[in-house]
Amino acid sequence: MSKLDEQLIALGAVFEAATLVDRIARTGQVPNAALGCMLGSLLARNPQTTLEIYGGDDLNLRDGYRALVGALERDSSSLQREPLRYALAMIGLERQLDKRGDMLQVIGSRLDQIQQQVEHFGLTHENVVASFGGLYQDTLSTFRQRIQVQGDMRHLQQSDNAAKIRALLLSGIRSARLWRQLGGHRWQLIFSRRKLLDALYPRLRSTQSEDR
């Protein structure tokens, strides 16, 4: 797998988290498999490949790839504005997090504790999701730059939905960190659009064929 493909998997995961946040905010619903994929990426230890972080295939990143394609094509009919806003905000927050070694240490320690919870309850259990959400609230939510999620207040005010949204934002920021560690940079989204799209189209097609 090329370096660019590795970057696209991580960037696709940022956009996947963003689309799931938007879906919960608008509908109160989220596919359990996609939620599990993103939460599982927070606990991946010593993966052999980037894809392994997301369960070994990118089927559950398909909606993220679609949103990323829409952003890179700059086609108003396919552009998903809120997910794009959330994705860019997560990339921005990761840059701030990178300067906070103390916070990174806290996050690492708390994720170890959550791993123990997962072994007892399961990855998408409400107690585990609440712990992920609480970790986001205690760390990244304290930055001056906050991600303002727009949607239906009936869904946003439900505590379990709020926890899922925070947990997904945490996973998106983790994927943004991975993307940058793999050599990804925001300038690519402006100056390397065609190169990214040429590599992204086959990845998106492969996830669609797997689903049939």
From Swiss-Prot:
InterPro entries: HflD, HflD-like_sf. Its main location: cytoplasm. GO terms for cellular component: cytoplasm; plasma membrane. It is a peripheral membrane protein. Keywords: Cell inner membrane, Cell membrane, Cytoplasm, Membrane. It is found in: Cytoplasm; Cell inner membrane. Belongs to the HflD family. HAMAP family: HflD_protein (MF_00695). This is High frequency lysogenization protein HflD homolog. It comes from Stutzerimonas stutzeri (strain A1501). The gene is hflD.
